[in-house]
């Protein structure tokens, strides 16, 4: 077994003797696409225990926090990420996920009119102000939920889809299991206070990511800054959407859970999902979400170590029709790294040599390992990039003879 270390040079990682470049990185200077990004840098607001990050502890005013890279799924910051806590109006993400799924399946249309019951009309909290006995277009209800955080609009959807909000909550729980939410339980469609209504901030981030990934054709509603219905114009409650520093998703507040927010932003082609909960005020929520979103973009980058089919090394073949076989990656590999990752990362390839013919394209011949402080540890199989048939009998005889006879 031979093990070789990759040398990480500039924007590529090159194995001595290898011909292909590895590790092309996004090197564009990170800058938010909005003038608000030029605001003075905020210092951390230390409150309680700090959050865990690959770079070490980071203070945050949030009681619960989770930040994730959308493309790689890498966890950039965690604080109580799996604790089951009141999700407040961030619950509405699941209501909308189910609505979007119905629309995509053709079981509901944007122009459909849904009836408003007295229960929906009487619902307290944040409202779209639908009128009892009327009907409302699905598209208006979507904006009523996302922009205005309308509890009444959620009830209209729940009753239209499942007959009652109680039955709709059962559907929400089924969907939560299907998409991998493990610290979530729903009792209603709105996030109205209920001691059994729980979500972890990691689950909220997962749900937000599924909305963006599974239903991109509907995600544009999240970036709308206001919506007027029934003569009442209401602004989007998400402070980051209002400032143009995020393109979604939802805020929330309950007495038990405090002020929360799930937001997503894309800068220079890289998307981050941030979830904070348990803050003391709207102002603290706005400032902390901006600060930590900036921190995530400033301190990490997405690095493509290699793409599918890249030749990592050439391995000698014994008794084959070709002297070597290319060792290739079976898939593209992009990871999220600290920005000084070249000083932290250790990348090695290991393979047995020589390989005995015949070799079939796709055979696993070695592995690549990635490790280092703050670097996600992983192991990737390396595959034969071509078929190498076995030599015929005369060829094998000559190869054996040349191997054992000096000077031949």
Predicted stretch roles:
Residues 25-202, 208-214, 227:
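Active-site-adjacent loops and short helices of periplasmic peptidoglycan-processing enzymes
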Residues 6, 76, 407-408:
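Catalytic-site microenvironment of enzymes
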Residues 21-23:
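Boundary at the C-terminal end of the N-terminal hydrophobic targeting segment
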Residues 1-12:
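N-terminal secretory signal peptides and thylakoid transit peptides that target proteins
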Residues 14, 31-35, 401, 406-408:
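N-terminal pre-domains immediately preceding structured catalytic cores
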Residues 9-10, 143, 223:
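Phosphate-coordinating loops and pocket residues in cytosolic domains that bind phosphorylated ligands
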Residues 182-185, 193-408:
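Domain-terminus/edge residues, biased toward the C-terminal soluble/receptor-binding domains
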Residues 14-16, 368:
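Hydrophobic core
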């Amino acid at each position: 077994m031979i093990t070789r270390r990759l040398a990480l040079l500039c924007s590529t990682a090159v194995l001595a003797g290898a011909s292909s470049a590895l590790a092309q990185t996004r090197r564009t200077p990170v800058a938010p696409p909005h003038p608000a990004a030029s605001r003075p840098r905020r210092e951390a607001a230390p409150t309680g225990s700090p959050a865990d990050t690959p770079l070490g502890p980071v203070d945050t005013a949030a009681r619960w926090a989770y930040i994730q890279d959308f493309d790689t799924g890498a966890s950039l910051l965690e604080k109580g990420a799996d604790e089951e806590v009141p999700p407040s109006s961030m619950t509405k993400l699941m209501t909308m996920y189910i609505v979007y799924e119905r629309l995509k399946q053709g079981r509901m249309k944007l122009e459909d009119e849904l009836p408003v019951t007295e229960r929906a009309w009487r619902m307290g909290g944040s409202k779209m102000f639908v009128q009892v006995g009327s009907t409302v277009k699905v598209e208006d209800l979507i904006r009523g939920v996302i922009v205005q955080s309308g509890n009444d609009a959620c009830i209209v959807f729940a009753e239209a889809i499942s007959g009652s909000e109680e039955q709709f909550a059962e559907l929400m729980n089924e969907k939560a299991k299907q998409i991998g939410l493990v610290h979530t339980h729903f009792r209603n469609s709105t996030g109205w206070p209920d001691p059994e209504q729980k979500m972890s901030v990691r689950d909220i981030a997962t749900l937000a990511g599924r909305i963006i990934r599974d239903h991109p054709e509907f995600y544009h509603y999240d970036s709308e800054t206001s919506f007027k219905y029934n003569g009442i114009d209401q602004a989007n409650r998400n402070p980051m959407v209002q400032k143009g520093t995020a393109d979604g998703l939802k805020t929330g507040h309950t007495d038990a859970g405090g002020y929360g927010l799930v937001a997503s932003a894309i800068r220079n082609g890289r998307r981050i999902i941030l979830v904070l909960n348990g803050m003391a005020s709207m102002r603290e929520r706005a400032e902390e979400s901006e600060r930590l979103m900036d921190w995530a973009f400033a301190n990490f980058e997405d690095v493509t170590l290699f793409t599918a089919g890249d030749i990592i090394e050439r391995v000698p073949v014994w008794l084959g029709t070709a002297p070597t076989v290319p060792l290739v990656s079976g898939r593209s590999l992009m990871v999220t790294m600290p920005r000084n990752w070249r000083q932290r990362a250790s990348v090695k390839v290991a393979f047995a040599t020589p390989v005995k013919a015949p070799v079939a394209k796709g055979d696993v011949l070695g592995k690549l390992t990635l490790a280092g402080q703050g670097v996600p540890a992983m192991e990737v199989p390396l595959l034969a990039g071509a078929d190498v048939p076995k030599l015929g009998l005369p060829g094998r005889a000559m190869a054996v003879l040349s191997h054992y006879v000096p000077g031949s």
